[in-house]
């Protein structure tokens, strides 16, 4: 019992500290978030707020590939507001449980271009796409080649966790390794 109280107290103190350090609306939402699990690097949120703020309160379509614990879908709903159409895509059918009003979870693989084309025709033009899926660069490349053309002219395409392009063990990556997403999008592009 004592350990449970201590753990909750430490978690609460961390949340207060994060709220105190928060500079943006998105960082504040993340700092006070108590819903489903969200697994994103903290430094993303200040950058996201800088680029996403102009979409808040608007009728937009957001697609996040990789639902995982469902927490980021909750954050996006709060951040963008009730007019936003939020879609999550995951290969795990259990992720359907994270659906809520205005937020749909679609089940399928980002490595399947036919499925991605069907998804794009179903949801329409995309304002913001966040690829937080498998992190395998083959999947990242398939997703980019298939869905980038469905991003609105003033839309954003974000591919998270590009560090996976450098991980030889889990992702067959490496520095300057041909075929990785980083090399595809590299400085010469």
List the model feature ranges, each with a label:
Residues 1-130, 134-159, 163-189:
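A short alpha-helical cap/connector motif
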